[in-house]
């Protein structure tokens, strides 16, 4: 199998990591077993643009077990784990990617995956989907559809569909209950602080943590910050989410006011310039900033650099920016996705990604079976419920079922008081 990775000799180390996550991804392992018998992807090429680490390699192996030829590249220049890509290549996957890619290399690797002429795409952030529309239109007729993992990617694709520019169907895997209620909330909450604490060795208890954005990712971050003993401030542009954050017990204020108190500031909005010039001018001395959104646009690093009288690297993944008045502001992982782009970041726990990648695998099979028209589609409820039931089963949990009388009662509109 063709591959382009940093060091193929790292494969044994990566294989150990993959075997470990497989033991903690029982739903995906069950699907892998089913796929190995059914071969739903026999003769199909699947191209993915995902964070290349042990859990995503396991997804690739699941698709491979289903008969697919799989080509994989990374969706972030800093999130690739080189031992995992080496192991994936040794296991028969077409791997393209390494940690520390330049922007040019990043897009070259996406093109390398597209050179395999995939019929199904699995994307995280929609860069591959956009690239095939803009630069490889000759491939569009051969693409059955795609699955998108993130809120950011789905927002971009819905805008594309609204303009009539989307040429094939996309399954919004992010909109599945078994994805966003767990991956976005519990996964992001835990992995964000795993990475921040591992990178900085800071104590969270007693700190003021500002969380920009109160979607499902922001909720998870705020919840974990509070659990670690921090005082939490939430910033929002949506009045309903802001009200919800206040009712959940957090202080709510404008970003411009919150930065004056922030010991740690974390962005999770999916939008651009959330923290920029005016915020940097008023930011508390010693504030540590991190981004948990998909793209590195939420914290305006360029503006921060221009405002600074001096910049430097404190240690791996920690930059310092010294302002004209002597204040120091710290930025983790270049403002990229901190839970994966940081050297210490391992991404979400395997038990969480078990559900998200189960949804990816089953949604890809659904695309192949149904071949819907171009557009953005929510994954069918039956797939969502199937994944939830398999996860409960793997956890040894049994739940009740409605009796026939209860079912009829819920369906009957005539009964009242």
Swiss-Prot record:
SUPFAM superfamilies linked: Formate/glycerate dehydrogenase catalytic domain-like, NAD(P)-binding Rossmann-fold domains
Pathways per UniProt: Amino-acid biosynthesis; S-adenosyl-L-methionine biosynthesis
CDD domains for the chain: SAHH (cd00401)
Classification via PROSITE patterns: ADOHCYASE_1, ADOHCYASE_2
Pfam families noted in UniProt: AdoHcyase, AdoHcyase_NAD
InterPro entries: Adenosylhomocyst_ase-like_sf (IPR042172), Adenosylhomocysteinase-like (IPR000043), Ado_hCys_hydrolase_NAD-bd (IPR015878), NAD(P)-bd_dom_sf (IPR036291), S-Ado-L-homoCys_hydrolase_CS (IPR020082)
Membrane-traversing stretches: none
Keywords, alphabetical: Cytoplasm, Hydrolase, NAD, One-carbon metabolism
Reaction catalyzed: S-inosyl-L-homocysteine + H2O = L-homocysteine + inosine
Essential cofactor(s): NAD(+)
Binding site for NAD(+): 150-152, 184, 213-218, 236, 271, 292-294, 339
Sites where the protein binds substrate: 124, 149, 179, 183
GO molecular function annotation: adenosylhomocysteinase activity; trialkylsulfonium hydrolase activity
One GO CC term, this protein: cytosol
UniProt-annotated location(s): Cytoplasm
UniProt keyword Cytoplasm present: yes
Chief location category: cytoplasm
Entry function: Catalyzes the hydrolysis of S-inosyl-L-homocysteine (SIH) to L-homocysteine (Hcy) and inosine. Likely functions in a S-adenosyl-L-methionine (SAM) recycling pathway from S-adenosyl-L-homocysteine (SAH) produced from SAM-dependent methylation reactions. Can also catalyze the reverse reaction in vitro, i.e. the synthesis of SIH from Hcy and inosine.
NCBIfam families: ahcY, PRK05476.2-3
Miscellaneous field: SAH is a product of SAM methyltransferases and is known to be a feedback inhibitor of these enzymes. As a result of this inhibition, organisms have evolved efficient enzymes to metabolize SAH via different pathways. The pathway found in methanogens differs from the canonical pathway, it uses the deamination of S-adenosyl-L-homocysteine to form S-inosyl-L-homocysteine for the regeneration of SAM from S-adenosyl-L-homocysteine.
Protein name: S-inosyl-L-homocysteine hydrolase
Organism phylogeny: Archaea, Methanobacteriati, Methanobacteriota, Methanomada group, Methanobacteria
């Amino acid at each position: 199998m063709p591959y382009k990775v940093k060091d193929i000799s790292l494969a044994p180390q990566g294989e150990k990591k993959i075997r470990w996550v497989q033991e903690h991804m029982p739903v995906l392992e069950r699907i892998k077993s089913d796929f190995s018998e059914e071969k739903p992807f026999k003769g199909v090429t699947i191209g993915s643009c995902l964070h290349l680490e042990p859990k995503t390699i396991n997804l690739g192996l699941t698709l491979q077990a289903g008969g697919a030829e799989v080509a994989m590249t990374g969706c972030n220049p800093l999130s690739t784990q080189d031992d995992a890509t080496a192991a994936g290549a040794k296991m028969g996957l077409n791997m393209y990617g390494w940690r520390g890619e330049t922007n040019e290399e990043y897009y070259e690797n996406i093109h390398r995956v597209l050179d395999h002429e995939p019929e199904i795409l699995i994307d995280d952030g929609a860069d591959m989907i956009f690239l095939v529309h803009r630069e490889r239109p000759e491939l569009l007729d051969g693409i059955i559809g795609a699955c998108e993992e993130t809120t950011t990617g789905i927002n971009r694709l819905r805008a594309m569909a609204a303009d009539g520019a989307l040429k094939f169907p996309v399954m919004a895997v992010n909109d599945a209950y078994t994805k966003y209620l767990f991956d976005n909330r519990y996964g992001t909450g835990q992995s964000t602080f795993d990475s921040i604490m591992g990178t900085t060795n800071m104590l969270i208890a007693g700190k003021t943590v500002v969380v920009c954005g109160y979607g499902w990712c922001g909720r998870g971050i705020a919840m974990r910050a509070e659990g670690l003993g921090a005082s939490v401030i939430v910033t929002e542009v949506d009045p309903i989410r802001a009200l919800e954050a206040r009712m959940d017990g957090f202080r709510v204020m404008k970003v411009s006011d919150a930065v004056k108190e922030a010991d740690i500031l974390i962005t999770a909005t999916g939008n651009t310039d959330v923290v920029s010039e005016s915020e940097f001018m008023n930011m508390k001395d010693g504030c540590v900033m991190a981004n948990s959104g998909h793209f590195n646009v939420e914290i305006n690093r360029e503006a921060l650099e221009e405002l600074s009288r001096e910049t430097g690297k404190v240690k791996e993944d920690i930059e310092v920016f010294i302002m004209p008045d002597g204040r120091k502001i710290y930025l983790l992982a270049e403002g990229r996705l901190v839970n994966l782009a940081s050297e210490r970041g391992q991404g979400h726990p395997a038990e969480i990604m078990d559900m998200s990648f189960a949804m990816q695998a089953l949604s890809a099979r659904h695309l192949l079976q149904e071949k819907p028209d171009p557009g953005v589609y929510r994954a069918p409820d039956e797939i969502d419920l199937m994944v939830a039931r398999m996860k409960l089963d793997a956890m040894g949990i049994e739940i009740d079922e409605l009796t026939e009388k209860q079912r009829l009662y819920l369906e009957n509109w005539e009964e009242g008081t």
